[in-house]
Design a protein with these regions (language model features):
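Secondary-structure boundary/capping residues
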Residues: 16-19, 112, 172
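Acidic-residue sensor for enzyme active/binding pockets
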Residues: 3, 142, 166
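Mid-to-C-terminal catalytic subdomains of enzymes
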Residues: 91, 95-145, 149-159
């Protein structure tokens, strides 16, 4: 995906190791059915894999990037983090998303102004099955739009062959006029 490619590139740019952890959330029907606690099941799979990896690497603590702004949202994945003893240092230090951006800019990190990019599964309406094919369709559509100059966007999958493109108000006319 575009996010994975970005992560690899940025890790190389800033000189840190990058490791891809394979997960198998599609084997869990509770994830695939896409109920409102989908994130819990996905994060449980991720943190279970990280438990094994951290043990094999003799890593004592797994951190995540949860910040204080995330605490006011519905985030069932936070329960999975708690169950797996994942630490949220940004929350512990009282750091918000705006603080993260400010710190990253001050450290000249290339991602300081990157638009938010929630999980692709969040682009599929609750109750619609999450499938690899649907996620790939959303990812390819978003990548194509980004390559054609659109930023801060979402493509949402709806039942059947319907996709909804969400862009900032100043880009709506370009999408509607098919000026791509």
């Amino acid at each position: 995906s575009g996010e994975l490619d970005d992560a690899r590139r940025i890790a190389t740019e800033i000189g840190i190791a990058h490791r891809v952890v394979e997960t198998n959330e599609f084997a869990n029907p509770l994830y695939v059915q896409n109920s409102k606690d989908r994130c819990y099941h996905c994060k449980t799979e991720l943190y279970s894999q990280l438990d094994g990896l951290s043990e094999s690497l003799d890593v004592q603590v797994v951190f995540n990037g949860t910040n204080t702004d995330d605490l006011g949202d519905y985030r069932p994945g936070l329960q999975a983090a708690s169950e797996h003893s994942v630490v949220s240092p940004l929350v512990e230090c009282g750091i918000s998303k705006a603080d993260v951006r400010s710190l990253a800019e001050g450290w000249n990190l290339p991602t300081w102004d990157k638009p938010a990019s929630p999980c692709l599964s969040s682009r599929i309406a609750y109750g619609e099955e999450v499938t690899a094919e649907r996620l790939q369709m959303v990812d390819l559509a978003e990548q194509w739009l980004k390559e054609n100059g659109f930023v801060n966007l979402r493509v949402r999958y709806h039942r059947g062959d319907i996709a909804r493109i969400e862009v900032p108000i100043d880009q709506v006319a370009s999408v509607a006029a098919n000026e791509l």
